[in-house]
């Protein structure tokens, strides 16, 4: 698993497997799930990640 934060785009990427991505789905606003050719999850992308973390800390 690899985790990367890009401050320029405010995107947090969590890559579970090194596999080519076949399709992506926005499962909720700002959360993308990328799937491989076998249908399994390859990567999660959190858009506006700093806002998501900020809201989580408020809970």
Spans of model-derived segments:
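Structured beta-strand/loop patches that form or line metal/cofactor-binding pockets in enzymes
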Residues: 2, 7, 14-26, 30
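Extended lipid/amphipathic-ligand handling interfaces
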Residues: 34
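A short, polar/charged loop-to-alpha-helix boundary motif
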Residues: 51-59
């Amino acid at each position: 698993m690899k985790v990367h934060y890009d401050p320029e785009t405010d995107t947090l990427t969590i890559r579970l497997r090194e596999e080519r991505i076949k399709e992506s789905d926005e499962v909720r606003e700002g959360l993308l799930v990328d799937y491989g050719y076998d249908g399994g999850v390859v990567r999660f992308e959190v858009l506006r990640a700093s806002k998501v973390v900020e809201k989580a800390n408020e809970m």
